[in-house]
Amino acid sequence: MLIKVKSAVSWMRARLSAISLADIQKHLAKIIILAPMAMLLIYLAIFSQPRYMSESKVAIKRSDDLNSGSLNFGLLLGASNPSSAEDALYLKEYINSPDMLAALDKQLNFREAFSHSGLDFLNHLSKDETAEGFLKYYKDRINVSYDDKTGLLNIQTTGFSPEFALKFNQTVLKESERFINEMSHRIARDQLAFAETEMEKARQRLDASKAELLSYQDNNNVLDPQAQAQAASTLVNTLMGQKIQMEADLRNLLTYLREDAPQVVSARNAIQSLQAQIDEEQSKITAPQGDKLNRMAVDFEEIKSKVEFNTELYKLTLTSIEKTRVEAARKLKVLSVISSPQLPQESSFPNIPYLIACWLLVCCLLFGTLKLLLAVIEDHRD
């Protein structure tokens, strides 16, 4: 066996040594240019399948932008909203994601559609292709580009038939619209849920403070200690005024009557009775015991302040909810289709003149390089 291998190697060496550089240069054009060009032409004529492209242009805008008409003017002026640009890039990533591929495969039977590529082995998708290979094949069949000047997202889809290319693009638009709606509504729901949670907390605090106020009124058998204390103070002031007037009248009586005169005695008794009433009313207002009006008024004021504060807080949360609803509705994002996908009339791929020109250019460059290299080798031999 070893002897046979050595014989074969010796034969190959003999054949290679017999081939001169002149022979190689003589057939170099056939090897480098004609043979590859023939292979390309055979592939294009026999194996390649025509592929059709459908194209659409979309923009992501907020609902208030649409209402104000800023969509048309913004696009005409070449301006793009930073928020819309960010959303467009998010959408671009989603379109190229496995989630979008799964949705397309479910609706279009994507794997089955691209497995029927005829004899085109370069664009064939195996039914047993791995998930990674399937995703790579999908990305080769869709092109999503973002124009930062106009804020437009350009979506190009290809298929082996015009109908599939169109349906492919339409389904991408439908799933993109669902993604944008879900993303903006989810943000709005989160904001509204937070506002409603804060409102519920404020309502519970308000109910608790109201219950505390009612319990205080029931336990102390009083409606408003502050009002009662103010009424008692007003009454004491009135009685004090009456007492001062009666004392003045008594001094007037003493100018012409004796101390034991009936009018004087009666006036003194009236003043003493009035003073006793004043003392009694004052004892209701201020006293060291905790059930007096002054202490009750302080406690009541604290509880009442809690109720008023929690009431205002509850009103603020209600206002916040309404503002959140309005703001969420204003910031809802929509997918605006600027250019709808159309049914292609001509195949876009393969671009035969372009492929032939590029292939010929590459072959000629390679031919020139090898030709120069062989010439250098020939000079060194000489």
Curated annotation (Swiss-Prot):
Segments traversing the membrane: 28-48, 357-377
One of the GO BP terms on file: polysaccharide transport
GO MF annotation list: carbohydrate:proton symporter activity; protein tyrosine kinase activity
UniProtKB keywords: Capsule biogenesis/degradation, Cell inner membrane, Cell membrane, Membrane, Polysaccharide transport, Sugar transport, Transmembrane, Transmembrane helix, Transport
Cellular localisation: Cell inner membrane
GO CC terms of this entry: Gram-negative-bacterium-type cell wall; plasma membrane
Membrane topology: Multi-pass membrane protein
Coiled coil start-end: none
Superkingdom, natural source: Bacteria
Family: Belongs to the BexC/CtrB/KpsE family.
PANTHER family in the record: FERRIC ENTEROBACTIN TRANSPORT PROTEIN FEPE (PTHR32309:SF13), TYROSINE-PROTEIN KINASE (PTHR32309)
Main function: Involved in the translocation of the polysialic acid capsule.
The protein's name in its UniProt record: Capsule polysaccharide export inner-membrane protein KpsE
Lineage, broadest ranks: Bacteria, Pseudomonadati, Pseudomonadota, Gammaproteobacteria, Enterobacterales
